[in-house]
């Protein structure tokens, strides 16, 4: 499984980072970055479901 963030869709709200700080971090550009794309996938799925713009995808 892989976790990805669509930087064009990300608005930098920080929901993903708050839910999964080991997986996501807001970068210098204010957009979410994936720190560990293959770690804590249940948490990453929760973040994807909570992302207001649908910028996070979890591919199985």
Swiss-Prot record:
Disulfide bonds, paired cysteine numbers: 20-43
Name the Gene Ontology molecular function terms of this record: 4 iron, 4 sulfur cluster binding; electron transfer activity; iron ion binding
Sites binding [4Fe-4S] cluster sit at 10, 13, 16, 51
Q: Which cofactor does it need?
A: [4Fe-4S] cluster
Query: 4Fe-4S ferredoxin-type domain location, by residue?
Result: 2-29, 30-60
User: What UniProt keywords are attached to this protein's entry?
Assistant: 4Fe-4S, Disulfide bond, Electron transport, Iron, Iron-sulfur, Metal-binding, Repeat, Transport
InterPro entries in UniProt? 3Fe4S_ferredoxin (IPR001080), 4Fe4S_Fe-S-bd (IPR017896), 4Fe4S_Fe_S_CS (IPR017900), Fe-S_cluster_ET (IPR051269)
Instruction: Quote the function comment for this protein.
Output: Ferredoxins are iron-sulfur proteins that transfer electrons in a wide variety of metabolic reactions.
| Full protein name | Ferredoxin
Q: Which gene encodes it?
A: fdx
């Amino acid at each position: 499984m892989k976790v990805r963030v669509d930087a064009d869709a990300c608005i930098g709200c920080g929901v993903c980072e708050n839910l999964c700080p080991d997986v996501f971090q807001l970068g210098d550009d204010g957009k979410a970055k994936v720190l560990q794309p293959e770690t804590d996938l249940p948490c990453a799925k929760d973040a994807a479901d909570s992302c207001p713009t649908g910028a996070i995808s979890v591919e199985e």
